[in-house]
UniProtKB/Swiss-Prot annotation:
Protein name: UPF0301 protein BAB1_0506
Protein family: Belongs to the UPF0301 (AlgH) family.
NCBIfam families assigned to the protein according to its UniProt record, in alphabetical order: PRK00228.1-4 (NF001268)
Species classification: Bacteria, Pseudomonadati, Pseudomonadota, Alphaproteobacteria, Hyphomicrobiales
One GO CC term on file: cytosol
Length: 200
């Protein structure tokens, strides 16, 4: 796995990559966070924290936004019953987004990488409720955003580590251990990290 990839035009920016917050991250909202970057260009960047949970459960969220009624809660497919809702970031926190495998496409679906897509409409929630939808998916409320040049500056100031994003790490259910496992996967001993973290 490639680490510490610096954003640049030649490398196509950081679309489809992970950001891992350095231990000295001063913004508590991003402490020990793993962020999946969906869009990164000279106009800025956006992504989702994938290892923080929202207090709301997926079935309750479906009911709150009118996808299902109270009576439907007992007949939800097993997958929908156990799907969790992530805290994607501090921006637009009432808006829902679904990162998913590329076997599901609607008009509003945006490809992020060769095998990951993003859909932010209610159609995909209805598909998951109906027992269909993509094979792999994660739901997030809110997103993380950076102004032009901001993310590049934070990476340069050692606020973030960057690395490739294997699908198993993106979609697996071990949310609490994801940060430590990615550090270990990159061969990083956190006790020996020297940092002067930037701001997120």
């Amino acid at each position: 796995m490639t680490t510490h990839r610096k954003p640049s035009q030649e490398q196509g920016f950081l679309n489809g990559q992970f950001l891992l917050a350095m231990p000295g991250m001063s913004d508590e909202r991003f402490a020990r966070s793993v962020v999946y970057i969906c869009a990164h260009s000279d106009e800025g960047a956006m992504g989702f924290i994938i290892n923080q949970l929202q207090p709301v459960q997926f079935p309750d969220l479906l009911r709150q936004i009118g996808v299902i009624g109270e009576e439907d809660l007992i007949i939800l497919p097993d997958r929908a019953q156990h799907m969790v809702v992530r805290n994607g970031g501090p921006v637009d926190r009432t808006r829902g987004f679904v990162l998913h495998s590329d076997d599901y496409m609607v008009d509003s679906t945006m490809p992020v990488s060769d095998d990951v897509c993003l859909t932010a409409t209610v159609d995909i929630l209805r598909a998951i409720y109906g027992g269909g939808g993509p094979e792999r998916a994660l739901m997030a409320l809110g997103y993380s955003g950076w102004a032009p040049g901001q993310l590049e500056m934070e990476v340069a100031e050692n606020g973030w580590l960057t690395c490739d994003a294997p699908l198993d790490m993106l979609f697996d259910s071990d949310i609490e251990g994801k940060y430590s496992r990615l550090m270990l996967h990159m061969g990083i001993d956190m006790s020996r990290l020297v940092f002067d973290a930037g701001h997120a």
